Amino acid sequence: MRTRLNFLLLCIASVLSVIWIGVLLTWNDNNLGGISLNGGKDSAYDDLLSLGSFNDMEVDSYVTNIYDNAPVLGCTDLSYHGLLKVTPKHDLACDLEFIRAQILDIDVYSAIKDLEDKALTVKQKVEKHWFTFYGSSVFLPEHDVHYLVRRVIFSAEGKANSPVTSIIVAQIYDKNWNELNGHFLDILNPNTGKVQHNTFPQVLPIATNFVKGKKFRGAEDPRVVLRKGRFGPDPLVMFNSLTQDNKRRRIFTISPFDQFKTVMYDIKDYEMPRYEKNWVPFFLKDNQEAVHFVYSFNPLRVLKCSLDDGSCDIVFEIPKVDSMSSELRGATPMINLPQAIPMAKDKEIWVSFPRTRIANCGCSRTTYRPMLMLFVREGSNFFVELLSTSLDFGLEVLPYSGNGLPCSADHSVLIPNSIDNWEVVDSNGDDILTLSFSEADKSTSVIHIRGLYNYLSELDGYQGPEAEDEHNFQRILSDLHFDNKTTVNNFIKVQSCALDAAKGYCKEYGLTRGEAERRRRVAEERKKKEKEEEEKKKKKEKEEEEKKRIEEEKKKIEEKERKEKEKEEAERKKLQEMKKKLEEITEKLEKGQRNKEIDPKEKQREEEERKERVRKIAEKQRKEAEKKEAEKKANDKKDLKIRQ
């Protein structure tokens, strides 16, 4: 028995050794950041025809001027015009019914069932309550799949902008972007040496603090970035979420291939705002154990963060420039160039697609669009070398709401999510980049861009007589030219040129896609608002007049009551005086009677006269009292009616 057990253990050890040797032999250092460089069996583009037709896309960019002896340059001097080719978009399918079932099987989310409309079928529940967008992907060459994370939200009201909770779900797609439901990946965990079985779609186990009856819980803005792990590319999913006390929103990463290790990032010796988002991740080639982030573009601030405990140091910062716009809002995770090329020592270059947010431009109140960016490290310094104008890849961007036309809503939103893959596909140096993006917070799609590396390698900048030599791509790669003051000024100029061009783009976009209609709609909304304000003003004036009338009527009633009270008091005094006078007369008569003898008949007559006078006085008082009581009741009734 022991012999058999030893033999079995020996067999297992042999198999693991073969697997390990295979990993070492097949691992390629150039396979980094989601980029496959060999163009062989690990290529994401085995069948180029399956990508569809490529259409021309002209791109204008602005390149920094690195020459101190050049004159002050304008945007035209810094501009670079080139041509890219881009495919139509490919919308990524998502079986929300399948994903819903997975989510509801998890204990923490089981209460969601009670919030769904129970009268609906499952399909109808999905259509009413469940939404998805914001998919970010990377290609895993060793598995021949695209790994994508997307945001799935549940809304009890049936409104995507009013979620109860937000959940991150991982999916895999084949090379042709067909969703693989029920498929799995076996991943060798570098820390435990054990195989981790991952079935897809997969709900990432992120603590959400989901509470029934509360809103806006869960993870948002998922981004996936690749790093070089010990056994191959290792995807890290970055997101923002509320902390356990629900008072702060922070940046996190979760490692799906490392037992879902989750890290929250905190910046040392820095007072972080309550809400954090839009950090842009990237890795240095020689340091895959720490992640770097562009924290912000103005000020340009770069962080270096531990993947173990989340502690971050600010490793580079250029002070905020008040004159420089802050319309750059986040970017796709940055990746290196798709092939190893000679460059200066201790220098590194990344490509990314940041996004702009421009208000009140073109046919929308808010316009979001991608830009192309070249980001450079020289030693411990970082800077932006190139920015393009706004890109829309030839799309008619979905409206945020409205009747389906590009200019039928207040927002026009095209958000770049991630660079899925970038590789050289043939011996001629032709390259293809795949970009995932979202439109109108309601979709996830990919496009393929051809010739971006060639676009960059052919660029040239200022070539005036004062320049020592042209500012071309080879010069960017081979020289170290960072200078704090000059570089800051260059970045300010390049960003200013790019953002001015972006504003020109959105104006043109509006003119060609319904600016007149937008103006008409804005005018109608303005008239409607003015009418509402006028009606509100009239209503207020009417209420003030009514209030004034009631106050005046109240004063009249109070004045009348005062006069009546005074009259009653005067009559009371008069009656008292009459009574007193009568008593005096009676007393006088009685006194006279005692002093003289009076005839009994005369005495009886006088007594009867006295009684008659008393009776008349009493009768008069009674009638006056009844009259006053009747008048008082009538006045009280009238007063009550006025007050009502």
From Swiss-Prot:
Compartments reported by the entry: Membrane
Topology Extracellular: residue spans: 28-644
GO molecular function, one term: mannosyltransferase activity
Listed Pfam families: BMT
Membrane association type: Single-pass type II membrane protein
UniProt-annotated glycosylation sites, renumbered to this chain: N484
Source taxon at top rank: Eukaryota
Classification via InterPro entries: BMT1, MAP7_domain-containing
EC numbers on record: 2.4.1.-
Biological process (GO), any one: cell wall organization
Name of protein: Beta-mannosyltransferase 2
